[in-house]
A protein has these predicted regions:
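Conserved ABC ATPase signature
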Residues: 135-145
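ABC ATPase nucleotide-binding domain "signature" region
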Residues: 36, 86, 147-152
Length: 152
């Protein structure tokens, strides 16, 4: 039987006493599958994503990622090891950095070598080569969102 890439079983998450999400069940069958969480403000979409990415703790239930069970009392898995990136509506690009520098910013901090083959493939896939030398205020909202995806 094939393992799912990600599964949440009766997951509960809490960003604060006010912002609680209970009994979430979710299955993502394949790595690379694109999903969207939709709902009104304050319903817990960001809390769920932050927990999956390892930025918040699971308070109850299980998250199974690539066959490895994560629970509120499990061994911590670093966010980088989860290999999950988040991209939100507010892309928060650095206004004084060119697009290419925005894309490579985190990579330079993590490994010191800047753009990688994978970054170049993503740049081509997202068709943002023509805007790499522009600043965020010089590009459209859609282009800014693609830059945010490339950076993540």
């Amino acid at each position: 039987m094939d393992k799912n890439f990600l599964e949440i079983q009766n997951g509960s998450f809490s960003a604060s006493e006010k912002n609680k999400v209970n009994n979430v069940n979710l299955v993502i069958k394949n790595q690379g599958e694109i999903i969207s969480l939709l709902g009104p403000s304050g319903i817990g979409k960001t809390t769920i994503l932050r927990t999956i990415a390892g930025l918040q703790k699971l308070t109850n239930g299980k998250i199974i990622l690539k066959g490895k069970t994560l629970s509120s009392n499990s061994v911590h898995v670093e966010p980088e090891e989860r290999n999950i990136a988040l991209s939100f509506q507010d892309n928060s690009l650095f206004p004084n950095y060119k697009v290419i520098d925005n894309i490579n910013f985190g990579k330079k901090r993590l490994n010191g070598n800047g753009s990688s083959l994978k970054s170049n493939e993503i740049i081509k896939l997202l068709r943002i080569e023509p805007i790499l030398e522009k600043f965020p205020h010089q590009i459209s909202a859609g282009e800014a969102q693609r830059v945010s995806l490339a950076r993540s």
